[in-house]
């Protein structure tokens, strides 16, 4: 039985993963650097030192990873001032979980003000008992720390807590934490590794809701 639900944000609740992929080029250009193929994909779902280490892998150990990430965040902050597109089925899923008194949390690698801004822009904040940002944990996805903290705030056992994720790192984190992990693919389809980790794959949030209603989740 599912006693709580933890939502990833980018690419799961909102169609923002595509946006993040476009932020890297102008962010790097502002520092006189060129975008290197594969960076956006490698960075997907990460935060903090994990994110900076990936930057160093692409631009060398001596690069100013902090400056690069700060530049990325400046581009993102400007773009996220306006409402971003919601994923199909989000409203219906939130309303059903709320009506059935199942507590919800957001656990996202994004910064706190970005999470709050996206939720506030659509009037969704009231649905969530907890918001956990990548800024609040030492280890980012694929480490399960962010999901474990969210479950602690919800007061639920990971074994009975549903994690909804679109990214590979997110699925890895959910599985590592012992959560009921459902992948809802966005930019990347599930591969053999993901199929070996997740509990179930759903094509969209409408299907997640249908599985909850029938008790398959």
PLM features per residue range, with description:
Residues 1-3, 95-98, 111-217:
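Asp-based, Mg2+/Mn2+-dependent phosphohydrolase catalytic module
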Residues 2-100, 113:
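N-terminal helical cap/lid subdomain that shapes the substrate entry/recognition surface
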Residues 11-12, 38-39, 80-81, 106, ...:
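Short, contiguous strand/loop micro-motifs
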Residues 13, 44, 104-107, 139, ...:
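Conserved SAM-binding loop
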Residues 23, 36, 63-67, 84, ...:
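Short linear functional motifs in flexible/disordered or boundary regions
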Residues 25, 33, 74-76, 105, ...:
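Homeobox/homeodomain signature
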């Amino acid at each position: 039985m599912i006693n709580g639900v933890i939502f990833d944000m980018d690419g799961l609740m909102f169609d923002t993963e595509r946006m993040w992929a476009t932020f890297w080029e102008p962010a790097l250009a502002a520092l006189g650097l060129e975008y290197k193929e594969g960076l956006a994909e490698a960075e997907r779902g990460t935060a903090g030192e994990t994110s900076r280490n990936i930057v160093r892998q692409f631009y060398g150990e001596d690069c100013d990873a902090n400056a690069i990430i700060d530049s990325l965040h400046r581009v993102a902050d400007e773009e996220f001032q306006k409402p971003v597109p919601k994923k199909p089925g989000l409203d219906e899923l939130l309303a059903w979980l709320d009506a059935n008194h199942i507590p919800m949390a957001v656990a996202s690698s994004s910064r706190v003000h970005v999470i709050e801004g996206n939720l506030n822009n659509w009037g969704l904040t009231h649905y969530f008992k907890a918001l956990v940002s990548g800024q609040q944990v030492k280890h980012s996805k694929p480490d399960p720390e962010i999901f474990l903290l969210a479950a602690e705030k919800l007061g639920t056992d990971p074994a009975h807590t549903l994690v909804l994720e679109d990214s590979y790192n997110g699925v890895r984190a959910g599985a590592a934490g012992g959560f009921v992990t459902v992948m809802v693919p966005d930019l990347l389809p599930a591969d053999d590794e993901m199929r070996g980790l997740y509990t179930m794959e759903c094509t969209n949030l409408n299907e997640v809701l249908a599985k909850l209603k029938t008790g398959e989740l």
